[in-house]
A protein has these predicted regions:
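C-terminal helical subdomain
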Residues: 180, 186, 202-246, 250-251
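Active-site helix of classical SDR
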Residues: 124, 160-162
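Residue(s) in the substrate-gating loop at a strand-loop-helix junction
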Residues: 144
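Conserved glycine-rich cofactor-binding loop
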Residues: 16-17
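Conserved glycine-rich Rossmann-like NAD(P)H-binding loop of the short-chain dehydrogenase/reductase
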Residues: 30-46
Length: 258
């Protein structure tokens, strides 16, 4: 537990399972109270109860669809009502979609954009003015290791392009906020063993090509515990065997009819 972080408050989105749950636990292990958000209320409340029991911190479970501005506003308001202020934001909610571009449903574009980009930007906008006033705060954005590839991975170009936009935004925000006491860090993880990647065909054929969430937990722990005058701009955590090192990912199993 970090004495400097004990009693602070973090919002973690997409936190009922997978990477988000792991990151909420990481924050709690540092003595940070956590407001966790996800769409499904049942698993969210279960996760909150687990965290309180294991880490002896305060939690708040807020059902939230990050594509809806009113849900984001409710998340921020309820967190401030319970904890007083928001010290840390871990933007993690995300969706993926694997299609060759010419076969990708057009309705996917808006869902991906609102979840993986606008949801992040809007939530940051809702919390950042209080951070600016206090001259203190930390924002961690879940980007993607796919943004390190050139060209972007085949069948993920819309997803990866939006993550590229998020990476650029996050980097620009770092420079805009660095003299105001606010840290902004981007995480660029490789393909991680979660239920989200379980839907991807070739990637999950060999478990050695997947990372565990522990590597990302360690990256977040590092970002939160470096000295006050230091901020990691980007942290790339890539499995040595990750498929993102190859520009082409075969597309075959899940949509053979397309």
């Amino acid at each position: 537990m970090s004495a400097e972080l004990k009693g602070k408050t973090a919002i973690v989105t997409g936190a009922s399972r997978g990477i988000g749950k792991a990151l909420a636990c990481t924050a709690a292990s540092l003595g940070i109270n956590v407001a966790i958000a996800a769409r499904q209320e049942g698993p969210l409340k279960e996760t909150a109860a687990e965290i309180e029991k294991q880490y002896k911190v305060k939690t708040l479970a807020v059902p939230c669809d990050v594509t809806k501005l009113e849900d984001l506003e409710n998340l921020v308001n309820k967190t401030k009502e319970k904890f007083g202020q928001i010290d840390i934001l871990i933007n993690n909610a995300g969706v993926s979609s694997q299609y060759p571009f010419e076969k990708q449903p057009i309705e996917d574009f808006e869902k991906l954009a609102h979840t993986n980009y606008l949801g992040y930007v809007r939530l940051i906008r809702l919390v950042i003015n209080d951070m600016i006033e206090r001259k203190s705060g930390a924002i961690i954005n879940m980007v993607s290791g796919s943004t390190l590839c050139d060209p972007l991975p085949r069948s993920f170009i819309v997803y990866s392009s939006l993550k590229m936009g998020l990476r650029a935004f996050s980097k620009a925000l770092f420079w805009e906020m660095r003299d105001r006491g606010i840290k902004v860090t981007s995480l660029l993880p490789g393909v991680t063993d979660t239920d989200l990647t379980g839907k991807l065909d070739e990637i999950t054929a060999d478990a050695s090509r997947l990372m565990s969430t522990k590597a990302i937990e360690d990256a977040v722990r590092f970002a939160l515990t470096v000295p006050a005058n230091v901020c990691p701009l980007e942290i790339a955590v890539i499995n040595q065997q990750t498929p993102w090192t190859k520009p082409v990912i075969p597309y075959k199993q899940e949509h053979p009819e397309k």
